[in-house]
């Protein structure tokens, strides 16, 4: 199920929560457009902080918490190593990124992880930044649409595979050492 969220402070959170409530997904993969050059960035951490203007230009925040009672940060619950390895195997430039900034992308990542931790147990959440599409007139190297779509599909497939794996307890893990 694909849904587009507006780049508007807290409206994106309200809609994200409404979509999660409506569809009750087992995973939420959010995708944002990142930099004008590759690689794909697998975001590892969502922080409870937002700063900067939104696309309306009406709201400009400075280091405001997304959820005032929430923890400082959450780690993505996606299989980031499997996603990274798969994209590398596909020849798609990729790297880990350890925080999604303080903008809307981070707001969406943190919100999805917070909702998973507080209301939707068992739901996994993560975020990837894909490069902009190439634009020679603007001097943007970017990444072509085919590679971008392939990167997103590979990440969805790896996240879905992880959902099917049985979860082992720490005791079960230790027994296999």
What are these regions (language model features)?
Residues 105, 109-111:
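Active-site glycine-rich loop that binds ribose-phosphate moieties when present
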Residues 123-127:
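Short coil-to-beta-strand
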């Amino acid at each position: 199920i694909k849904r587009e969220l507006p780049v508007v402070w807290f409206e994106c959170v309200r809609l994200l929560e409404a979509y999660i409530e409506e569809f009750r997904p087992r995973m939420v993969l959010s995708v944002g457009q990142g930099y004008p050059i590759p690689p794909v960035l697998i975001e590892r951490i969502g922080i409870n902080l937002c700063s900067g203007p939104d696309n309306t230009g009406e709201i400009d925040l400075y280091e405001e918490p997304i959820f005032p009672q929430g923890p400082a940060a959450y780690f993505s619950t996606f299989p980031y190593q499997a996603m990274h390895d798969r994209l590398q195997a596909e020849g798609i430039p990729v790297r880990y990124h350890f925080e999604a900034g303080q903008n809307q992308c981070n707001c969406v990542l943190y919100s999805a992880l917070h909702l998973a931790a507080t209301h939707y147990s068992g739901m996994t959440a993560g975020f990837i930044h894909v490069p902009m599409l190439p634009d020679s007139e603007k001097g943007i190297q970017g990444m072509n649409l085919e590679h971008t779509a392939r990167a997103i599909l590979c990440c969805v497939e790896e996240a879905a595979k992880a959902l099917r794996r049985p979860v082992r307890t720490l005791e079960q893990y230790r027994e296999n050492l």
